[in-house]
């Protein structure tokens, strides 16, 4: 029987092997969103525990039917996974892509890929160090894949809850009510009123950017959602330091978790993270 490490009125945190927890839980068919960042398919063993190579893929793919069993009919699974490299070679491995593809195509789970997101972190340390900083023959590996999956083609989702603030040029356009209408080289025809409706923001794109930005800056230019990557003095880090604990080395950004929770759930829905770590998902939910 699963026993919670701690609980609040809004949720519970368990220490358990996720496979065993799911098999003995009472959450089947009740979870609206599974949001998680599992151990990445790395070449080296980490302190927090991880599989490597084919062993990793087999383990990860086996989780698909377990996760699917927890979902409501319109529920979603969102998984963040980093890139992997061949050991001792300056080439990328296909392990992470094969793992994700075989996960969603697992015949024992009824899943499909709704959309892929990219999470770009320009402040990430140069890696793989051997090929980027020592031999200088590769560029910095600075993004992770985020796959949004579900049991049907129309899971619960509302992009009006993840609107980005308008750019200055769009604010100016709305204020003046003027822009160049008519035909474009792409053969699209823009009417005289197409861009004049006030929607309280622009629809988010599927490229998310982590960046050390001023807290007063709502967004960077162009089409990316900017997430401030300033964790060195946040509540979690300060609390760990105060209590003598080592902070989790690979935390999901709060804003990233909030983005998908806002996008794919309503208040009162159940959100589950099978690899809780520092409990970012629980905190945001």
Question: What does each model-found stretch correspond to?
Answer:
Residues 1-285:
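Core catalytic lobe of class I
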């Amino acid at each position: 029987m699963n026993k919670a490490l701690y609980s609040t009125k809004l949720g519970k945190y368990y220490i358990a092997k996720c496979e065993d927890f799911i098999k003995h839980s009472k959450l089947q068919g009740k979870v609206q969103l599974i949001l998680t960042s599992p151990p990445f398919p790395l070449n080296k063993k980490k302190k927090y525990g991880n599989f490597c190579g084919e062993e990793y893929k087999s383990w990860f793919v086996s989780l698909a039917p377990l996760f699917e069993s927890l979902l409501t009919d319109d529920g979603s699974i969102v998984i963040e996974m980093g890139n992997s490299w061949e050991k001792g070679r300056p080439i990328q491995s296909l392990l992470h892509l094969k793992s994700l593809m075989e996960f969603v195509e697992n015949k024992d789970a009824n899943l499909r890929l709704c959309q892929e997101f990219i999470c770009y972190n320009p402040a990430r340390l140069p890696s793989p160090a051997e090929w980027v900083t020592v031999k200088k023959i590769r560029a910095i590996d600075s993004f992770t894949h985020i796959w949004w999956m579900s049991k049907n083609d129309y899971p619960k989702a509302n992009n009006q809850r993840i609107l980005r603030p308008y750019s200055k040029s769009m604010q100016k356009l709305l204020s003046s009510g003027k822009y160049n209408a008519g035909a474009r080289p792409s053969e699209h025809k823009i009417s005289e009123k197409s861009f004049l409706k006030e929607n309280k923001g622009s629809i988010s794109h599927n490229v998310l950017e982590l960046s050390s930005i001023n807290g007063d800056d709502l967004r960077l230019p162009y089409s990316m959602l900017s997430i401030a990557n300033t964790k060195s003095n946040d509540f979690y880090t300060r609390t760990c330091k105060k209590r003598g604990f080592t902070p989790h080395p690979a935390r999901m950004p709060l804003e990233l978790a909030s983005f998908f929770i806002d996008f794919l759930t309503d208040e009162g829905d159940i959100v589950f993270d099978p690899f809780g770590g520092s409990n970012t998902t629980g905190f945001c939910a």
